[in-house]
Each structure stands twice: as structure tokens, then as C-alpha cells.
Regions:
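Polar, S/T/G-rich
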Residues: 1-79, 93-94
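Substrate-binding cleft and catalytic face of glycoside hydrolase catalytic domains
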Residues: 68-88, 122-306, 324, 329-338
């Protein structure tokens, strides 16, 4: 019997029987193991050697963690609480998702450890990837992927939606192996959600686009030339050519048509999100659901009416997800930290739009979602000798980092170019039009959240605000 050293554990019944009721300690705060009637004849009539791995949270960080995201997510059976095997060679059994001996699967061992090390854990996000194959919005297909198109005698068959292994997207090779793991099977996702809920944890389902564009591709790039960047960030999916590139359809009806193809094509974004929501519903529901994340290259595309068609589609998708998932599920979109607060045209016009406000104010959206990687330091190695302009004593100056949450880069100043960053030539953030510098300060969440938002077009601020209501989400 294993006692994990909790503050509520009771005395072991064998020890209590030997020492008498009320005389046996519970050893609360101490982890220990009791063996009863162990058959020593199997070990030469002497105690065998035992080996234990003891884990406990050290310091404040692990004990303060309340939520985690399970990444990278690209694992065909890694989310399965049950062991899965195949037979790569006749007669040779291989465990696919069990690389340990202390639990039935890697998932079970990992979650057991996570809960032991993070006692205040309440919420887990499951990252669920499908694979995009093109940065051109109108040509990008989003499909479930596998690392091999066949498997020999699998104990659990891989299937996603109605796609079998033989029909799935084959993930490209990088070096000696696949560039990514595969999409988790539907069966494993449902089992993972149910297992997390059985552990008393809340669950977020996080649909995620991974871009499988190999280095040797010859795809036209939205940003110019032939050959798209290898394994790019999903935030670079955009119209073709991209805004600012010669011949771009941005601000025309054609841009809207390309976005429409991305969302509603045979392998479009709507199909992806609907399937993820269906999985959540089949698993008995989830506590939160994301409409994806960091698709800033799409949310910034304008049509011929200065509207943002992908944002309109996100609003429709939010309503569709609400219909599937019900009122008890929180829904949002994980906007990039450089995306959530608005869109500033880079064409010299000075146009400024709070382009995501229709989404943030939509009744199906419960919260403002931000993938937050805002810079908190501008530390250089030379600062050890020459001093840091922001008063940092070291790269790990906690007081300095705390100050930079509402100051520094993205609040007081910005770097106008790569050269400016290299030389630390800082430009102040100011608003000469309406005296509202917060519209350009991505770090100034409080002002963005507390004020009405007015779009700007052709050098003038609109007289009517957007649909955003301060403090509403």
C-alpha cells in the first residue's frame, strides 16, 4: 500500500492492528510504502532490493501553477490513457505510448506526476493539431496528419473524423524522421478529456494549426518569390500576395474570396473546428474551447468595404461552437499579443481599426483571449559592464521584470527598425491625432479594456465607437 504523504492520510490498518487502535501514527507529510505478506521465497528468503522514485514540489512555482497546456499535441496515441501497440516486424510487439513501467501509459504517468508536483492544478488545455500546407489562404488545406500511411497490427486503429490512416496527410520528413508527430486519434482525444474530468480537472480544447511546409517546397510565397519559409508560423497565413506586396488583393473583394476558401473549402477551417467541437461534445463536454489562435495574417485582411472578413467568419464560428457546446462552455479566440488590440495599416495611411471588436463583443464570446509573449526585458550581455537603461541589475531582476509589465517596450517606446533595436534607438509611443497613446500600446491592457474604441480612416477618427463596451468581457 502506498501512502503519498498527504495531510489527510489515515494510519495503515496493519500497523494499527499491531500497535493498537489510536497508537499508530498516520505519518502525515511523509510518503511511505507498506508490504504485507510479501512472499520472500521468491527472492531467496530475503528482502529484495526496492527502488522508488519520490517526487514533491520544491519552491513556490510548482505549488502556484493552476493551469497547464499539454504540448506539442502532435502525437497519434500520446493522449490515450490506455496502452497502444503495433507490430513493426512480424512477431515483434512495440508499445507506442508506453515508455515507462509505473503506469499503463505515458499519459497516465505524466498526469499522475503533474498532479503530484502541482497540487493546486485546476485546469488543463489539450492542444489538438491539424496540419496546414500553404501560407496562401485560398490554397491552404487543413487536414489531420500521420507519420506513416500504414501500421502493422495496431491494437487501436487511428482514425480522425472519417479519415483513415491511408487517406490522411502524410507529414513531411525532416532529418531522420517526421517533422511533427501526427494528429491525435479521435478515440484518444475523447478518452483524454474524460480522464482529465475524472481526475477533477477542468478541460480546455485548443484546436491548433501546425504548418507542414517542408524546406524543399516550390510554393509561391505571399510575401514574394518562389518557396515558402519552412515550417512557418500559422500567423503568416494570409491573402496572396500579402498586404503591402505588389498585386495584393487586400482591400478588394478578391481578398474576401480567398478568406472564404480558407474557411469553407473542402478542408477548410470550419470543418476543423466543427470536428473538434463534436469531439468535445462526444466526451461529455469541456469547460472551455478556443477558436484557434494567432491567425493575425488572416484577421488583418480587408475586403473592398474596409471590413475584415476572417473576423466575420470567426463570429459565425463562435455562434456555431456555442450551439454545439452549450452555455456551460467558455469560448474565446487566442489572439496574438500583437493582434488582440487592433490593426494598424502599414501603408502610410494612418488607418487604425479595432478589427477584432466584432468578435470580442459577440455574445458567444466569453473572454478576451491573448497568447501573451509581450517583451518584459531589453537585456544585453554588455549591460553587465555598461549598465541597463531600464535599471535592471541582472537579466533575472524580478523587480525590473515586474515594472516592465506596464512600462518599457510596447508601452512607453518601440523600436522602429531592426537597426534601431541593435543600437537601442528608442522611439516614444505617442498619438498626435487624439491624444490616446494607448491605441498603440499593446501592453496597456487596462486602457484598452476601459475605453470605448473608435476606428480611424484617412486621418480622421470615427464619430461612432465600435461595438466594444468597456469592462464587458
Amino acid at each position: 500500500r502506498v501512502y503519498r504523504g498527504t495531510d489527510t492520510q489515515a494510519p495503515d490498518p496493519l500497523i494499527e492492528a499491531k500497535q493498537g487502535a489510536g497508537n499508530a501514527p498516520a505519518y502525515r507529510g511523509t510518503a511511505y510504502v507498506v508490504f504485507e505478506r510479501i512472499p520472500l521465497d521468491r527472492f531467496g528468503n530475503r528482502l529484495p532490493q526496492f527502488q522508488f522514485e519520490v517526487m514533491r514540489p520544491v519552491g513556490k512555482v510548482a505549488q502556484s501553477v493552476r493551469a497547464v497546456a499539454l504540448i506539442p499535441g502532435s502525437t497519434e496515441f500520446g493522449l490515450s490513457p490506455d496502452p497502444v501497440s503495433d507490430e513493426p516486424i512480424a512477431g515483434q510487439k512495440r508499445w507506442i505510448n508506453r515508455n515507462i513501467l509505473r503506469a499503463r501509459s505515458d499519459w497516465t504517468a505524466s498526469l499522475d506526476e503533474l498532479q503530484a508536483l502541482c497540487p493546486d492544478l485546476h485546469h488543463v488545455a489539450i492542444v489538438l493539431p491539424w496540419f496546414g500546407d500553404d501560407l496562401r489562404a485560398g490554397s491552404c488545406r487543413i487536414r489531420p496528419g500521420v507519420t506513416a500511411l500504414s501500421a502493422r497490427k495496431p491494437s487501436q486503429v487511428w482514425k480522425v473524423e472519417n479519415v483513415t490512416r491511408a487517406d490522411a496527410h502524410l507529414i513531411s520528413r525532416s532529418g531522420d524522421g517526421a517533422a511533427y508527430g501526427g494528429t491525435p486519434s479521435d478515440q484518444s482525444v475523447i478518452a483524454a478529456i474524460r480522464d482529465l474530468k475524472a481526475r477533477g480537472l477542468k478541460v480546455t480544447l485548443y484546436p491548433f494549426i501546425m504548418m507542414d511546409v517542408p524546406p524543399d517546397n516550390q510554393l509561391p510565397s505571399p510575401y514574394g518569390g518562389i518557396g515558402q519559409p519552412a515550417y512557418p508560423w500559422r500567423g503568416r497565413i494570409t491573402c496572396h500576395p500579402a498586404a503591402g506586396v505588389a498585386g495584393s488583393p487586400d482591400k478588394t473583394a478578391v481578398a474576401g474570396e480567398q478568406v472564404q476558401a480558407f474557411v469553407d473549402g473542402p478542408w477548410g477551417y470550419r470543418r476543423f473546428l466543427n470536428h473538434c467541437a463534436d469531439l468535445a461534445q462526444q466526451a461529455g463536454g469541456v469547460d472551455a474551447f478556443l477558436l484557434g489562435s494567432e491567425l493575425r495574417g488572416l484577421t488583418g485582411i480587408r475586403d473592398g468595404q474596409d471590413s475584415f472578413p476572417f473576423v466575420t467568419h470567426l463570429c459565425a464560428l463562435a455562434a456555431e461552437m456555442r450551439a454545439i457546446l452549450g452555455s456551460g462552455c467558455q469560448i474565446t479566440y487566442g489572439a496574438d499579443w500583437s493582434e488582440y488590440f487592433g490593426y494598424q495599416a502599414q501603408d502610410g495611411s494612418g488607418d487604425l481599426f479595432f478589427n477584432l471588436d466584432p468578435l470580442w463583443s459577440h455574445p458567444a464570446i466569453d473572454a478576451i483571449g491573448i497568447d501573451n509573449y509581450m517583451p518584459l526585458a531589453d537585456w544585453r550581455d554588455s549591460d553587465l559592464d555598461e549598465g541597463n537603461p531600464d535599471g535592471f541589475e541582472t537579466a533575472y531582476d524580478l523587480d525590473g521584470l515586474t515594472r516592465q509589465v506596464v512600462s518599457g517596450e510596447g508601452y512607453d517606446w518601440y523600436y522602429a527598425s531592426v537597426e534601431d533595436r541593435e543600437t537601442r534607438r528608442r522611439s516614444p509611443i505617442a498619438d498626435g491625432l487624439a491624444g490616446k497613446p494607448w491605441v498603440y500600446r499593446y501592453k496597456d491592457l487596462e486602457s484598452w479594456w476601459s475605453n470605448r474604441h473608435y476606428n480611424r480612416l484617412a486621418g480622421a477618427e470615427a464619430t461612432q465607437p465600435t461595438a466594444w463596451v468597456p469592462h464587458s468581457k
